[in-house]
Swiss-Prot record:
Its EC number is 5.3.1.16. It catalyses: 1-(5-phospho-beta-D-ribosyl)-5-[(5-phospho-beta-D-ribosylamino)methylideneamino]imidazole-4-carboxamide = 5-[(5-phospho-1-deoxy-D-ribulos-1-ylimino)methylamino]-1-(5-phospho-beta-D-ribosyl)imidazole-4-carboxamide. SUPFAM superfamilies: Ribulose-phoshate binding barrel. GO terms for biological process: L-histidine biosynthetic process; L-tryptophan biosynthetic process. Belongs to the HisA/HisF family. It comes from Janthinobacterium sp. (strain Marseille). This is 1-(5-phosphoribosyl)-5-[(5-phosphoribosylamino)methylideneamino] imidazole-4-carboxamide isomerase. Keywords: Amino-acid biosynthesis, Cytoplasm, Histidine biosynthesis, Isomerase. One of its GO terms (cellular component) is cytoplasm. Pfam families: His_biosynth. PANTHER family: 1-(5-PHOSPHORIBOSYL)-5-[(5-PHOSPHORIBOSYLAMINO)METHYLIDENEAMINO] IMIDAZOLE-4-CARBOXAMIDE ISOMERASE. The active site is at residues 8, 139. It comes from the Bacteria. The lineage of its organism: Bacteria, Pseudomonadati, Pseudomonadota, Betaproteobacteria, Burkholderiales. The gene is hisA. GO terms for molecular function: 1-(5-phosphoribosyl)-5-[(5-phosphoribosylamino)methylideneamino]imidazole-4-carboxamide isomerase activity.
């Protein structure tokens, strides 16, 4: 079970939102690259970046911050003899040129969310053009998919869309319960497992992690197809210690991802 720190970018800073509300942003660092280094030193094996401005604007808005993070990751990997530390990014990615540019910059995975729901043809083309590097981010409330930075609720059932996108060839699904994200109310295990059981590709849980008990609960259902969990407010506010939580997850699942070698 992989614990993936989230670095949410707004106006070049690292922030956390409550339930996707841009007006409820807490700035945790004005230096995103330094924040990336911090999580790597705490044992992170993968990083999750979100361009919040981009998610609302529909185009990249924090590219310089992303590049600085990627540079920090490269330097850390080289210094420690690590072959690769994957970095994934979502927010405002609406065309193939943007995907190609980001991948050329050094990102391992591109997360497509709203654009996948609104323009499935784009997702299909992206999966074909960049096999193994496209992740779909599905944000849902009460089983219905939300779009546009969570500001709009669609009529699509999350499982139906996930199956469709799996057929397109996406690498994995990030499932966020937006009723719980940033609120630390515990992961929606039941909904996450239900989604994972319906797919053959991995599901990454997101939203609601509060403490080590949430991590242990996810580890207990990892075999249902849950690859990891994205951690945000809990690791920033200290209710979850990333290093000890990852160690505990490794102990419970009796494995360590290759990037830790």
């Amino acid at each position: 079970m992989l614990l993936i720190p989230a670095i949410d970018l707004k106006d070049g800073h690292c922030v956390r939102l409550k339930q996707g509300d841009m007006d409820q942003a807490t700035v945790f660092s004005e230096d995103p690259a330094e924040m990336a280094r911090h999580w790597l030193l705490q044992g992170a094996r993968r990083l999750h970046l979100v361009d919040l401005n981009g998610a609302f604007a529909g185009k990249p808005k924090n590219e310089s911050a992303v590049k600085s993070i990627l540079q920090a990751v490269r330097e850390y990997a080289e210094k420690n003899g690590i072959e690769e530390i994957p970095v994934q990014l979502g927010g405002g990615i609406r065309d193939l040129d943007t995907i190609e540019r980001y991948l050329d910059d050094g990102l391992s995975y591109i997360i497509i969310g709203t654009a996948a729901v609104k323009n499935p043809g784009f997702l299909h083309d992206a999966c074909s053009a960049f096999p193994g590097q496209i992740i779909v981010g599905l944000d849902a409330k009460d089983g219905k998919v939300a779009t546009d930075g969570w500001s709009k609720l669609s009529g699509h059932e999350v499982i139906d869309l996930a199956k469709k996108f799996e057929d397109y060839g996406c690498e994995s699904i990030i499932y966020t319960d937006i009723g719980r994200d940033g609120m630390m109310g515990g992961v929606n295990i039941e909904a996450t497992v239900k989604l994972a059981q319906s797919m053959t590709i991995p599901v990454i849980a997101s939203g609601g992690v509060h403490n080590i008990k949430d991590v242990e609960a996810l580890c207990a259902v990892q075999d249902e197809g849950i690859e990891g969990v994205i951690c945000g407010r809990s690791i920033y506010e200290g209710t979850l210690d990333l290093r000890s939580a990852q160690d505990r997850a490794d102990e419970l699942t009796d494995e360590a991802p290759e990037a830790d070698a």
